[in-house]
Amino acid sequence: MKYWIFKYPFILKLFLNLFPPLFFSGIKITYISQDFHRFQIKLRNWPGTRNANGSQFGGSLFSMSDAVYGTILMAILGDKYYVWDKKSVINFKHPGFGAVYLEGVITPLFIREIIEHTKNGEKYFPTVFATVHDKKGNEIATVSRTLYVRLKLSLIHITEPTRQ
């Protein structure tokens, strides 16, 4: 991936909003903070995202967090790390009628834990949690995503013991 995309939040936001899987699903990134640690996502209400009951399609709700957490984490960590989605779980609480929202936060402590667990090239599988809510604040679903994070092997400094 071209790392100039991660240089400024507005460039990443534009890139994600034009990314076909999100764009054609009615998903829009509405905000990314200057330090990339906070972001907001909106799933618009239109016929392409509604199910037979008129509420938001579960797959669209699930897609709100897909690719975004990993991509935001890549922006924070830089090009020294591999970041992929490994596993994801959604728990539907209530039907979502109308536009729904997800607000994500990646804390400095979370980043420090990743750096500590991966400093020698180990794989690390942190989990992030998010809540999807409607405009009244009602909880529609909760999502957990387990990520795969690893320092790129070419950047690991392995020291060989000296022989005497």
Residue map of PLM features:
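Alpha-helical membrane-targeting segments
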Residues: 1-24, 48
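HotDog/MaoC-like acyl-thioester-processing domains
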Residues: 1-6, 97, 107-154
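Short structured motifs
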Residues: 24-29, 86-92, 113-115
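Catalytic strand-loop segment that frames the active site of acyl-thioester-processing enzymes
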Residues: 24-55
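A generic structural signal for short beta-strands and their flanking turns/coil linkers
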Residues: 25, 37-39, 84-88, 98-102, ...
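Hot-dog-fold acyl-thioester-processing enzymes
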Residues: 48-70, 81-82
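Hydrophobic beta-strand-centered segment that forms part of the acyl-chain substrate-binding groove
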Residues: 72-109
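Conserved small/polar residues in nucleotide/adenosyl-binding loops
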Residues: 156-164
